[in-house]
């Protein structure tokens, strides 16, 4: 009879306790020693300072069953949960740890004894495979010579795309922190399940499943990527309880283990569902674990950070309950069954059961009030959707009005093969996200933490010079009374002509001057109702209360004004040319360029770009007056003024009009007349996300500089082609036609050379038990020609095994071909994998044809020499 999940957990802890390990309780899901982590996501999190040598324990060996959550940040599994066999928001990580005590030898021996020992897990040894980091020869030898695993079941895994330490077998908790090479143990479910061993093209299948990762902690990765040796080499291992339970209980999905079967039955009972195979049951069974334990560890639903992740998970579960037909609140009713199935690991949850149930019930009730209306709105929007992408505005409205996290909306859409414009959603959420970052301190910079009680009056519409008084000073985010020469600071004035970054327009630059001091302003930002001048005091001293003369960089402001006015003209022109579906999704207005993101489902045609340019320049030539009026928001909208989605407006708004061509709400600075812009020129059009296009353009002197540069390039090309700009098109077409002809002739010559080379090679084949074996390294042959040559040789040699290789710029290209009558004994994929491994690469393919690459050209001769022996053994 197989062990229950609770028994497996206890057996793991008992085994390592018998090996001198201290059994340490699971730490909270909220890390208390690592501000870089949203949630505890690995067993070693609570020991991070021990690995770094910053904390001392009265034991050097430890074992745990650690509660973990992966539903936000780098390790985000949420969208896959319920749809795959092994993704979870919550899981338990079984682990054993050595803090400068034992290292590779003992760690591997312990793992092998627990997995295969008759008194423990008793797994068949022949079902276990292992991987090691490519250069970790010591670990390889322990597995081969001491444990006795055959070489063919020990796989070296190198760096991804040559990036140092970017490997599945070089473990790191995050971008910084403890790390080191690791060895992973895989269980082979058998050939009745599709999939290949790790490192093979079929490795994503379900046949070979990773069950244990043993990390040899040797380094501390710094922010700049350097590796510093840890004080003492240590060991950190992790084995997912749910995965090993699936193996020991002889099931292929984690959701089929006893723990999840019990929870799924409980979910079916409280929702009234009858089909126990419904994926929504799996989603809810997973989500009750993460939600209940997060609440028990002090996380409450909110719109910020950890609380928002919890809210997302709860609401995803409630929505799946709705899909199952649940007519009343159900989610909180699963806490009791969860406590029962968790056994000893649920004791803390049991103590807080009433509170956890109340929190979950309240959140579910709040969401249930808007869920049906939100789903109805979403159904309505999807029904009239023209393309395959839901716009960000609708996604934001679902969030803002009905409490739909965007990934819940994405879940609904994914079931109908529809994407969500998350860029548009993020644009609408930007202000809320900024406030959340400031409040949490996660990644906040010093200036973002500034709080100013006073307000600044902006007078920059009419003045570029103004006298003001210093009302506050900040250095590194902290309020100070004075600053001295050389210090960087934020200066707040009672009134200022400096425009603070807003609505896409960059902040002004300039100077603050006074008695004996000069402060160079590099940027201007808003801090609540205050305007902060960011820069450096270049001379003198400055203190709160000082009088200053504020001088805006006039030439820079003038260029910004032209670009901002041109942005409005372009917005209106885009709506005329492309349609009224065009809506602003983001913008940047600087002194050098204007950038405009807008909703549109396809790339603009050259003719459309020209139309927009022509329309804007026509309005510039009309020299329309640019007028501003202050009016009520409702009146402005009634007048047809366009408001930007995501922007928050006061009841009284500033309406900017350019004749009858453009009317928008805008607080930015602008030209006096459209003619001031001079010239408008689009320099690029591109896509930034699904349904979002981006235009970059220049105006005035910048536009003239672009025209001159293009003219110069055309003249240079004409000179190279020995023509002039008038007949440049004909010259280029002639060159391209000649190039195509030469390329065609060259390819014909290459084909002839390859055919001749194939004919020459066929005579070099050797006979192995009636099968022709041909192995050759070819010089001067393009990699793509190898496949053609293999096809030719297979036709010539009939029953054959072929391996060809070439080296181009130090990179090895390999191909193996096997005639179909031989594939029952020799498979091209296995053969090419054996050769590729020796030259620092990997590859795969079909039984009759496989390709690979490698980086170690020096090892190629020896690798090719090994083919005959390998093939001979297969043909025996």
Swiss-Prot record:
**InterPro entries to which the protein is assigned, alphabetical:** aa-tRNA-synth_II/BPL/LPL (IPR045864), Ala-tRNA-lgiase_IIc (IPR002318), Ala-tRNA-ligase_IIc_anticod-bd (IPR018162), Ala-tRNA-synth_IIc_core (IPR018165), Ala-tRNA-synth_IIc_N (IPR018164), Ala-tRNA_ligase (IPR050058), Ala_tRNA_ligase_euk/bac (IPR023033), DHHA1_dom (IPR003156)
Q: Which GO terms describe its biological process?
A: alanyl-tRNA aminoacylation; negative regulation of DNA-templated transcription
According to the record's subunit comment, the protein's assembly and interactions are: Homotetramer.
Report the protein's function.
Catalyzes the attachment of alanine to tRNA(Ala) in a two-step reaction: alanine is first activated by ATP to form Ala-AMP and then transferred to the acceptor end of tRNA(Ala). Also edits incorrectly charged Ser-tRNA(Ala) and Gly-tRNA(Ala) via its editing domain.
Under catalytic activity, the entry for this protein gives: tRNA(Ala) + L-alanine + ATP = L-alanyl-tRNA(Ala) + AMP + diphosphate
Query: Which PANTHER family does this one have?
Result: ALANINE--TRNA LIGASE, CYTOPLASMIC, ALANYL-TRNA SYNTHETASE
Q: Which Pfam families match?
A: DHHA1, tRNA-synt_2c, tRNA_SAD
Gene Ontology annotations for the cellular component aspect, listed alphabetically: cytosol
Q: Look up the record and name the cofactor or cofactors this protein needs.
A: Zn(2+)
Which PROSITE patterns does the entry mention? AA_TRNA_LIGASE_II_ALA (PS50860)
Which organism is the protein's source?
Salmonella paratyphi A (strain ATCC 9150 / SARB42)
Q: Transport as a keyword?
A: no
Q: Which gene name does the record give?
A: alaS
Q: Which GO terms describe its molecular function?
A: alanine-tRNA ligase activity; aminoacyl-tRNA deacylase activity; ATP binding; tRNA binding; zinc ion binding
Family statement:
Belongs to the class-II aminoacyl-tRNA synthetase family.
Query: What protein does this entry describe?
Result: Alanine--tRNA ligase
């Amino acid at each position: 009879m197989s062990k229950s999940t609770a028994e497996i957990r206890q057996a793991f802890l008992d085994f390592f306790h018998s090996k001198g390990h201290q059994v340490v309780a699971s730490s909270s899901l909220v890390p208390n020693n690592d501000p870089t982590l949203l949630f505890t996501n690995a067993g070693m999190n609570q020991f991070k300072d021990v690995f770094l040598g910053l904390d001392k324990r009265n034991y050097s060996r430890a074992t745990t069953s650690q509660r973990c959550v992966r539903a936000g940040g780098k390790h985000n599994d949420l969208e896959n949960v319920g749809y795959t066999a092994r993704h979870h928001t919550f899981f338990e990580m079984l682990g054993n740890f050595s803090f400068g005590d034992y290292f590779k030898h003992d760690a591997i021996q312990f793992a092998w004894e627990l997995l295969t020992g008759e008194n423990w897990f008793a797994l068949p040894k022949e079902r276990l495979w292992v991987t090691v980091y490519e250069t970790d020869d010591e670990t390889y030898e322990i597995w081969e010579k001491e444990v006795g695993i055959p070489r063919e079941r020990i796989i070296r895994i190198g760096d991804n795309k040559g990036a140092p330490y970017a490997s599945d077998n070089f473990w790191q908790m995050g971008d910084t922190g403890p790390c080191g090479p690791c060895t992973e143990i895989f269980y082979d479910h058998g050939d009745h399940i599709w999939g290949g061993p790790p490192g093979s093209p079929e490795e994503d299948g379900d046949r070979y499943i990773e069950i244990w990762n043993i990390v040899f902690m040797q380094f501390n990765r710094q922010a700049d990527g350097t590796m510093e040796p840890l004080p003492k080499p240590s060991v950190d291992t992790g084995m997912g309880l749910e995965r090993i339970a699936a193996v020991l209980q002889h099931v292929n999905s984690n959701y089929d283990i006893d723990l999840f079967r019990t929870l799924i039955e409980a979910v079916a009972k409280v929702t009234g569902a009858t089909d126990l195979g419904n994926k929504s049951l799996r989603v809810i069974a997973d989500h009750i674990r993460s939600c209940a334990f997060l609440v028990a560890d002090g996380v409450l639903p909110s719109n910020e950070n950890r609380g928002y992740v919890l809210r997302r998970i709860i609401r995803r579960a409630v929505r799946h309950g709705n899909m199952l037909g649940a007519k009343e609140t159900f989610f909180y009713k699963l806490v009791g069954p969860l406590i029962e199935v968790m056994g000893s690991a649920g004791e803390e949850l049991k103590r807080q059961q009433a509170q956890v149930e109340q929190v979950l019930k309240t959140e579910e009730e709040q969401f249930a009030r808007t869920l049906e209306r939100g789903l109805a709105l979403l159904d309505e929007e999807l029904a009239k959707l023209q393309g395959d992408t839901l716009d960000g505005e609708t996604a934001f409205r679902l969030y803002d009005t009905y409490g739909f996290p965007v990934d819940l909306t994405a879940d609904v859409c994914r079931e109908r093969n529809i994407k969500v414009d998350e860029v548009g959603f993020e644009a609408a959420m930007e202000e809320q996200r900024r406030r959340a970052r400031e409040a949490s301190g996660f990644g906040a910079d010093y200036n973002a933490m500034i709080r100013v009680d006073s307000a600044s009056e902006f007078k920059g519409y009419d003045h570029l010079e103004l006298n003001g008084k210093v009302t506050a000073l900040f250095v590194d985010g902290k309020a100070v009374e004075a600053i001295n020469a050389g210090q960087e600071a934020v200066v707040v004035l009672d009134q200022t002509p400096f425009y603070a970054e807003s609505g896409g327009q960059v902040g002004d630059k300039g100077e603050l001057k006074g008695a004996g001091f000069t402060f160079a302003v590099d940027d201007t930002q808003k801090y609540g109702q205050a305007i902060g001048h960011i820069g450096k005091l270049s001379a003198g001293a400055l203190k709160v209360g000082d009088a200053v003369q504020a001088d805006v960089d006039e030439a820079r402001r003038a260029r910004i004004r032209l670009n901002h006015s041109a942005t409005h003209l372009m917005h209106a022109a885009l709506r005329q040319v492309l349609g009224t579906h065009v809506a602003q999704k983001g913008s940047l207005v600087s002194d050098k360029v204007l950038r405009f993101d807008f909703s549109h489902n396809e790339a603009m045609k050259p003719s459309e770009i020209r139309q927009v340019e022509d329309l804007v320049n026509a309005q510039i030539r009309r020299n329309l007056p640019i007028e501003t009026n202050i009016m009520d928001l409702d009146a402005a909208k009634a007048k047809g003024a366009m408001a930007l989605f995501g922007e928050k407006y006061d009841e009284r708004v500033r309406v900017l009009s350019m004749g009858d061509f453009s009317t928008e709400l805008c607080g930015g600075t602008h030209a006096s007349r459209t003619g001031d812009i001079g010239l408008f020129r689009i320099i690029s059009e591109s896509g930034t996300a699904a349904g979002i296009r981006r235009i970059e353009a220049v105006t005035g002197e910048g536009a003239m500089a672009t025209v001159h540069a293009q003219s110069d390039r055309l003249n240079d090309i004409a000179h190279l082609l020995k023509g002039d700009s008038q007949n440049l098109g004909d010259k280029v077409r002639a060159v391209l036609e000649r190039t195509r002809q030469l390329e065609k002739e060259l390819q014909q010559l290459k084909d002839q050379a390859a055919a001749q080379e194939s004919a020459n090679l066929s005579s070099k084949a050797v006979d192995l038990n009636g099968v022709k074996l041909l192995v050759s390294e070819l010089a001067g042959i393009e990699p793509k020609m190898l496949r053609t040559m293999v096809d030719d040789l297979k036709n010539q040699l009939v029953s054959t095994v072929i391996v060809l290789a070439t080296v181009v710029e130090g990179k090895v290209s390999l191909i193996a071909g096997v005639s179909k009558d031989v594939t029952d004994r020799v498979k091209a994929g296995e053969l090419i994998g054996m050769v590729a491994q020796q030259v620092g690469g990997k590859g795969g393919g079909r039984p009759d044809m496989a390709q690979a690459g490698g980086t170690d050209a020096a090892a190629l001769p020896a690798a090719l020499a090994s083919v005959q022996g390998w093939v001979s053994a297969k043909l025996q």
